[in-house]
Regions:
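A cross-family phosphate/adenosyl-ligand binding-site feature
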Residues: 1-58, 87-92, 98-148
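Hydrophobic alpha-helical segments of small multi-pass membrane proteins
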Residues: 77, 96-97
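Short glycine/serine/threonine-rich phosphate/pyrophosphate-binding segments
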Residues: 7-11, 70-79
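Structural loop-to-beta junction motif characteristic of Rossmann-like glycosyltransferase folds
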Residues: 63, 94-95
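A donor-sugar binding/catalytic signature common to diverse glycosyltransferases
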Residues: 56-76, 87
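Interfacial segments of multi-pass membrane proteins
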Residues: 83-84
Length: 149
């Protein structure tokens, strides 16, 4: 995750750490002073773009929680990167699970479906994200998809 000591992702990282998971923080140098103590490993990057690339490189499954423009940017960047990598690596496809709490991402999901149905998608599965309504469904989905990764 982004590796800083604030926000929803800090809470998720803390819970994962407390449950015995290894927590890897990928932190841009500009935010290194905010590195979360819960991280078992810290990877410093030059900037946000390098951070996204590194997170995509090392991730097995991607979870999109309710968030702002940065979350949407990371979601679409991850989707795009996976689609590009699939051209050269058949194993590049990895799950993106979107927690669509209270319809937070209804508009984005609809836009991706519309793009998928348009001639601009050129046969690519733009709408491949798996939408779930809540954390319970997220956990069920992660259990299911993690057996395939």
């Amino acid at each position: 995750y982004g590796g800083v000591n604030a926000g929803l992702m800090h809470s998720v990282a803390q819970a994962c750490h407390d449950a015995g998971a290894k927590v890897v923080g990928v932190v841009p140098e500009v935010f290194s002073y905010r590195t979360d103590e819960v991280c078992d490993e810290v990877i410093l990057t030059a900037d946000l773009n390098e951070r996204k690339g590194k997170m995509i490189e090392i991730g097995d499954v991607f979870v999109v929680l309710p968030g702002g423009i940065g979350t949407i940017d990371e979601w679409v960047s991850t989707l795009s990167d996976i689609m590009v990598r699939e051209k050269v690596d058949a194993n590049a496809d990895r799950p993106i699970v979107v927690v669509n709490h209270r319809g937070m991402y209804d508009g984005m999901i609809a836009q991706l479906a519309a793009t998928n149905d348009s001639p601009f998608a050129r046969g690519k599965r733009v709408d491949r994200s798996i939408a779930v309504a809540d954390i319970e469904q997220l956990l069920q989905t992660l259990t299911h998809v993690s057996t395939k990764v």
